C-alpha cells in the first residue's frame, strides 16, 4: 500500500549470497510480482552480508550446515528512517520493540506486519521516511 510513494522503499537482503546472484534475485522478485522500483533485492559478499545483518542490524543470520539449506536467520523486519536509524515502538511496559515479526514458516501473517504498517504510516506522516 506504500509502493506508490517516492519516500518509501524496501531493501530485502539475501542471507544466501553464494546462490542468490543478482539474476536469481531478479527472478525471485518477478515470481513475487514485485512492480515497485523502490523494492530492492540485494546481495553481496557473504562476509559483508552477515556482518551487516549481525552487527549492523543486530539480526542473526549465518551459515549452519546442520539446518535445511545450510544457513539460518531470524526473519525479522527492521524499520529504518531516512537518517539510517532503526525505529521502534514500545510494549505495554515501555520496553522498545525493535524488530517486527513477518511471515511464519507456515505462511501465516504475524501481528508484526500490522504493527510495521502502522509505524510506517506514523513515520511517513511525520516526515521521517
How does the language model describe each region?
Residues 10, 26, 62-65, 101:
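Sparse, context-dependent recognition of short Cys/His-centered cofactor- or disulfide-binding micro-motifs
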Residues 1, 34-39, 65-68, 102-105:
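Glycine-rich loops and low-complexity Gly/Arg-rich segments
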Residues 1-52:
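Structural microenvironment flanking redox-active thiols in thiol-disulfide oxidoreductases
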Residues 66-129:
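Thiol-/selenol-based redox modules, centered on thioredoxin-like
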Residues 28-31, 37-48, 54, 58-64, ...:
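Soluble extramembrane regions of membrane proteins in the secretory/endomembrane system
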Amino acid at each position: 500500500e506504500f509502493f506508490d510513494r517516492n519516500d518509501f522503499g524496501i531493501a530485502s537482503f539475501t542471507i544466501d549470497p553464494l546462490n542468490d546472484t543478482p539474476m536469481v534475485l531478479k527472478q525471485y522478485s518477478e515470481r513475487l510480482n514485485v512492480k515497485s522500483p523502490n523494492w530492492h533485492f540485494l546481495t553481496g559478499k557473504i562476509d559483508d552480508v552477515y556482518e551487516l545483518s549481525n552487527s549492523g542490524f543486530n539480526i542473526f543470520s549465518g551459515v549452519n550446515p546442520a539446518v535445511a539449506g545450510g544457513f539460518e536467520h531470524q526473519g525479522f523486519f527492521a524499520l529504518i528512517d531516512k537518517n539510517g536509524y532503526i525505529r521502534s515502538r514500545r510494549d505495554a511496559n515501555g520496553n522498545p520493540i525493535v524488530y517486527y515479526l513477518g511471515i511464519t514458516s507456515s505462511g501465516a501473517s504475524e501481528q508484526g506486519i500490522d504493527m510495521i504498517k502502522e509505524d510506517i504510516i506514523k513515520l511517513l506522516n511525520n516526515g521521517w521516511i
